[in-house]
Swiss-Prot record:
Further information: All late proteins expressed from the major late promoter are produced by alternative splicing and alternative polyadenylation of the same gene giving rise to non-overlapping ORFs. A leader sequence is present in the N-terminus of all these mRNAs and is recognized by the viral shutoff protein to provide expression although conventional translation via ribosome scanning from the cap has been shut off in the host cell.
Entry keyword Cytoplasm: no
Keyword Transmembrane helix (UniProt): no
Domain notes per entry: The tail region anchors the fiber to penton base capsomers, whereas the shaft, built from several repeated motifs, allows the knob to protrude from the virion.
Any matching Pfam family: Adeno_shaft
UniProt cross-references to InterPro entries, sorted A to Z: Adeno_fibre, Adeno_fibre_knob, Adenobir_fibre_prot_rpt/shaft, Adenovirus_pIV-like_att, Attachment_protein_shaft_sf, PbH1
Induction annotation: Expressed in the late phase of the viral replicative cycle.
Protein name in the entry: Fiber protein
């Protein structure tokens, strides 16, 4: 049988006649194969493959693509790229991004963190909160006086009295009289000054001093007065202050009185003596002299007579009495008696045993060296002018006839002549409260204990005796200035805090906001700060990747585009056919099992070709486009062909070696990946991968209620706050104020700033001084000292207290024989710390009541009998007030007369030593005089026990008319 090959040759069933038995097919072993399933398949090797639809396709790799015409052509876009551009396994150009960059809406964007945001122009900017502002493209502090910014940072403008001390802390310049104690400004308090309950300086006053009219004065008791601003002893009759300032008796020395052993003594002449055991001047009665009723009398003998209580001579012939003198008629001053001529003696004259005429001396008088002298006792002396004076010591002195106290050189101690009191002149800042000198602190000062300290509010504190400013995070002290610590990305520029704009960032001139300065090269576009690749036909972005768009019968296999297959229709098969692989019988049809890449086309077996492939007279071959050629059965790039130029837009650029990405400021490559280049003060968050600011101490992120982005804020604590305009300012409390943009102390009275040293000091007024350790203390004058409690008190000889009968006018003496008080006795006993008691006494009676006296009246007595506590006891005819002045409950024992100096009389009829007696001459109110004797430690009678006492006896009344008993004030003294 002769075969013929039809024009349309069927490779599967090439026979025209249908036969009942199946013959094995025939096929060319070159390109076809029968697989294990007895299916005829094409034998292909890579880069040929089958797509999902079973079409034979060509896998293209890097640098090759199939154009829309189905031709292969070179694609250098993926074969020559430079970091941060890269190509994936499919040959797609990608952008390697590192921390700080991400894609948003398929756009490259910077990932910003707290404190940074994008403005309306998509420029990176810093969000500033209160206290921060952006000026000249720099972040700076917005301050208000006394805060300011310098090239060194945030500083505090300080006024006088303030400076930066150790450890750069705010400190007060303290001068003399001030110190820092317990973190507070205080006045150094010296002796004599204390701090009262109102935290004011006050003088610490001891006994004998008081505060009056805001001055410290000496309390003058009875017997003392203030004259010419000096404490003076008020001297009465018989007392005076000598030129040496000593209180003494006022006597005329040499006239029967004199001082011996600091005691007033009577100089006795002939005819006078002191009987043994007695201190009384007694007469030696001679012939013609007798003592009757304690009076010296002359018994009238022959030739004598008593005439008008005077001894007179009964003159005879040849004698006459002339001017009370018996004389011869022929000679004056002589008289004859018993045939003898005798001298005629007048009052105060007498004769001794030898017949000499002598002076009759009374108590307190004596005859020495032929002269009658005053016998001066203790505390008295005879002055150079022969007058009886008192022995006194400074500060007592005589001013005219009065005893005064001298305050010369005593500083602030003054004398108020209106009320007779001492005072203390005080300067500004001091006042007197409750008899104490107080310091009046001004604003910003309070008392802490006894110390004057500044009243400080946070963040001011006391450190190392200086006022300091407590610094929070972000604030430090350097070169005596308060500075702001800056972290990475921040710097100081023109005295302001600014953000360092690194590569890829810049400040937009109109809004002064930080923005990106990115630029793009060819193949990329920059839209709204996002870099986008320019995609051509056949490319799209899916899942943030650039991929090739696949058409019909195309698929990806092993990273390459592959053509798909079309299932051929099954050939008509005769009934009851049997077949062997790759043939099979199905539904009475003989079918050919086709593998990928084979299809039945027009009832003929055909290859299913993908893009870039074709069948010509040479068989299956590749369709090559421009830039490619087949050489020796191998597909190669045409060396002489014109390369395809990629279409690139900024920031993609064409270089000699391929496609590159132009990087602008703020971008850099890190291990071939594009990332944001952060400068000082900025970093990439390691977790969230966004760009954020690095905040140092004192800065933080905040989120206002009306904003969605975080802003940068200055962290402040009181006294630093933000004003209404957001400026950083400084709150000042009591004691501080801001003047001329500087923080200054508010100085009250008693404080000032030295204009040279700028130290805070206490201006000193009169009576104050700066002592050791710069303490303010009272400058004491003569007569003043500090006691053990640092109070100002008078010197030992000036410490006084007074026991008295008060100033009432009611009668307080019941005379013997009466049942009710009849006279008012005023008695004051002023005791000095030396033990000397100065007494003043007077008595008053009137027509309505009281004791009346006349010439020759018998003696009257006032008994002041005292127990061992100085209280009046039974037997005293003094009653009523008997207390210590200004301290009624105080003990009176200190006023008792000394029993060693003045022995106690144990027998009522015995005699006391003369030193127990004080004789005084009183001037009666109705005219005349009387003698007053003060008896110390005498006894009233046997009916009353012996003990300490003061008994006043009035006698020798010399008056011409009957009158009530009242007389001048008498002054006396005794020792305790």
């Amino acid at each position: 049988m002769k075969r013929s090959v039809p024009q349309d040759f069927n490779l599967v069933y090439p026979y025209k006649a249908k036969r009942p038995n199946i013959m094995p097919p025939f096929f060319d072993r070159n390109g076809f194969v029968e697989n294990q399933e007895a299916t005829l398949a094409m034998l292909v090797e890579k880069p040929l493959t089958f797509d999902k639809e079973g079409a034979l396709t060509l896998g293209v790799g890097r640098g090759i693509r199939i154009n829309p015409a189905g031709l292969l052509e070179t694609n250098d876009l993926a074969s020559a790229v430079f970091p941060p551009l890269a190509s994936d396994e499919a040959g797609n150009v990608t952008l390697n991004m590192s921390d700080g960059l991400y894609t948003k809406d398929n756009k490259l964007a910077v990932k910003v963190g707290p404190g940074l945001s994008l403005d309306s122009n998509n420029a990176l900017q810093v969000h500033t909160g209160d206290g921060l502002t952006v000026t000249d493209d720099k972040v700076s502090l917005n301050t208000q006086a006394p805060l300011s910014t310098t090239s060194a940072g945030l500083s505090l403008l300080l006024g006088p009295s303030l400076h930066l001390g150790e450890e750069e802390r705010l400190t007060v310049n303290t001068g003399a009289g001030l110190q820092i104690s317990n973190n507070a400004l205080a006045v150094k308090v010296g002796s004599g000054i204390t701090v009262d309950a109102q935290n004011q300086l006050a003088a610490s006053l001891g006994d004998g001093l008081e505060s009056r009219d805001n001055k410290t004065v000496v309390k003058a008791g009875p017997g003392l007065t203030i004259t010419n601003q000096a404490l003076t002893v008020a001297t009465g009759n018989g007392l005076q202050v000598n030129p040496e300032g000593q209180l003494q008796l006022n006597i005329t020395a040499g006239q029967g009185l004199n001082f011996a052993n600091n005691s007033l003594a009577v100089e006795l002449g002939s005819g006078l003596h002191f009987p043994p055991g007695q201190n009384q001047v007694s007469l030696y009665p001679g012939d013609g002299i007798d003592i009757r009723d304690n009076r010296v009398t002359v018994p009238a003998g022959p030739g004598l007579r008593m005439l008008n209580h005077q001894l007179a001579v009964a003159s005879g012939d040849g004698l006459e009495v002339h001017s009370d003198t018996l004389r011869l008629k022929l000679s004056h001053g002589l008289t004859f008696e018993n045939g003898a001529v005798r001298a005629k003696l007048g009052p105060g004259l007498g004769t001794d045993d030898s017949g000499r005429s002598v002076v009759r001396t009374g108590r307190g008088l004596r005859v020495a060296n032929g002269q009658v002298q005053i016998f001066s006792g203790r505390g008295t002396a005879i002055g150079t002018d022969s007058s009886l004076t008192l022995n006194i010591r400074a500060p007592l002195q005589f001013s005219g006839p009065a005893l005064t106290a001298s305050l010369q050189g005593s500083g602030p101690i003054t004398y108020n002549s209106n009320n007779g009191t001492f005072g203390l002149s005080i300067g500004p800042g001091m006042w007197v409260d409750q008899n104490r000198l107080q310091v009046n602190p001004g604003a910003g000062l309070v008392f802490q204990g006894n110390n004057l300290v500044p009243n400080l509010a946070d963040p001011l504190a006391i450190s190392d005796s200086k006022i300091s400013l407590s610094l929070g995070p972000g604030l430090t002290q350097a070169s005596n200035a308060l500075t702001l610590s800056l972290g990475n990305g921040l710097e100081f520029s023109n005295q302001a805090v600014a953000i360092k704009a690194g590569r890829g960032l810049r400040f937009e001139s109109s809004s002064q906001a930080l923005e990106s300065s990115l630029t793009v090269g060819n193949g990329l576009t920059l839209t709204d700060t996002v870099i986008r690749p320019n995609l051509g036909d056949g490319l799209e972005v899916r899942d943030n990747k650039i991929i090739v768009k696949l058409g019909a019968n195309l698929r990806f296999e092993n990273g390459a585009v592959t053509a798909g297959t079309v299932n051929p229709s099954a050939p008509e098969a005769p009934p009851t056919l049997t077949a062997e692989p790759p043939l099979r019988a199905s539904n009475s049809h003989l079918q050919l099992s086709l593998s990928e890449g084979l299809v039945v086309h027009n009832n003929a077996l055909a290859l299913q070709l993908g893009d870039g492939m074709e069948v010509n007279q040479h068989g299956l071959t590749l369709r090559v486009g421009s830039g490619l050629q087949m050489r020796d059965g191998i597909l190669t790039v045409t060396p002489s062909g014109t390369p395809i130029e990629p279409r690139l837009t900024a920031p993609l650029t064409q270089t000699e070696n391929g496609i590159g990405l132009a990087l602008g400021a703020g971008l850099e490559l890190d291990e071939s990946a594009l990332q944001v280049k952060v400068g000082p003060g900025m970093r990439l968050n390691p977790v969230e991968k966004y760009v954020t600011l690095l905040l140092g101490p004192g800065l933080s992120f905040g989120q206002p209620a009306n904003r969605t982005n975080y802003d940068v804020r200055v962290s402040v604590e009181p006294p630093m706050v933000f004003g209404q305009r957001g400026q950083l300012t400084f709150l000042v409390g009591h004691g501080l104020h801001i003047q001329n943009s500087k923080l200054q102390l508010n100085l009250g009275q008693g404080l000032r700033t030295d204009p040279v040293t700028n130290q805070l000091e206490v201006p000193l007024g009169q009576g104050l001084e700066i002592a050791d350790e710069s303490q303010v203390r009272v400058k004491l004058g003569d007569g003043l000292q500090f006691d053990s409690q640092a109070r100002i008190t008078t010197a030992p000889n000036m410490v006084t207290e007074t026991l008295w009968t008060g100033t009432g006018s009611n009668a307080n003496v019941t005379w013997r024989g009466y049942t009710a008080p009849g006279s008012k006795l005023f008695l004051s006993l002023t005791r000095f710390s030396t033990g000397l008691v100065l007494g003043n006494m007077t008595i008053d009676s009137n027509a309505s009541f009281g004791q009346y006296i006349n010439a020759g009246h018998e003696q009257i007595e006032c008994f002041i009998l005292l127990d061992n506590q100085g209280n009046l006891k039974e037997g005293s005819n003094l009653q009523g007030t008997w207390e210590v002045k200004n301290n009624p409950s105080a003990s009176k024992a200190a006023f008792l007369p000394s029993t060693a100096l003045y022995p106690i009389l144990n027998e009522s009829r015995g005699s006391l030593p003369g030193k127990n007696l004080v004789g005084m001459q009183a001037i009666l109110g109705g005219g005349g005089t009387c003698t007053v004797i003060a008896t110390l430690n005498g006894r009233r009678s046997n009916n009353y026990p012996a003990g300490q006492s003061i008994i006043f006896v009035w006698q020798e009344f010399n008056t011409i008319a009957r009158q009530p008993l009242n007389h001048s004030t008498l002054t006396f003294s005794y020792w305790t």
